[in-house]
């Protein structure tokens, strides 16, 4: 059994890591950290984990210097990971970072969109943790930068089109997200009366996930990305509508074949040739469902993707990356059916 640690295990992504790892047969969670909750048993903070035999002796610690594991998940805020990750690296541990701190090779982009001065990248192999595009790099990495939730759904929605160079470089993404994507701390924006029966667009041209989407798509081909997110009155999920514009004369059947070939061996990407993906199909799972593939009379090709923002958009993808790094079956601890309805 491999021992793993979770730094920042009180938030939604930390809790989701614990939920998913409870069923993982090849790892044990030996350390969970929180300065605020230090000394408390895990189920005192996460009551839904009470009775899990694997966690019967698991308590929070406030001292990250005591953490010793094969791999560390850092579920910490943007800007905080870069303060602690180098120490874990120096001590020989593998790290999967769920913040945005290591997603950019060009640190000027990080500093521009996150408004944080970066402290530099450690001198180790770093991989962007989207397995469908970077599996070989992930296998060799000591540090994996887990992708953002919006970028995961957006990139997977159009990667085959960009790779095959059948669309114009202009790509427009419209995403609806659940409130859990804003984190565990309530704000005026996420307050129930402001979210309920409402749709709230935000950062309509300046969201920090825009350059992350664009830089990854540019590794496949041409891309100029526009992205607008909307906060929806749901707990989990991201539904992304990708508006692309055909540069070649291809029909719907040819496009579907391109997707089926591109993702043919990917266990967590499901292509729907007829149905339009729905959030309830992926809720609680590590799947990314892709469908739509409709072309209008002006040559606009619309593709829809659906993910659970806390699973494929965060903790599930982190565990998928861990499985790859350790040489486990990628499905280990993750292959579950969606909560529908």
From Swiss-Prot:
GO terms for biological process: L-arginine biosynthetic process. InterPro entries: AGPR_AS (IPR023013), AGPR_type-1 (IPR000706), NAD(P)-bd_dom_sf (IPR036291), NAGSA_dehydrogenase (IPR050085), Semialdehyde_DH_NAD-bd (IPR000534). Coiled coil: none annotated. It is an enzyme of class 1 (oxidoreductase). Transmembrane segments: none annotated. Its EC number is 1.2.1.38. SMART domains: Semialdhyde_dh. The active site is at residue 149. Catalyzes the NADPH-dependent reduction of N-acetyl-5-glutamyl phosphate to yield N-acetyl-L-glutamate 5-semialdehyde. This is N-acetyl-gamma-glutamyl-phosphate reductase. It comes from Methanocaldococcus jannaschii (strain ATCC 43067 / DSM 2661 / JAL-1 / JCM 10045 / NBRC 100440) (Methanococcus jannaschii). The gene is argC.
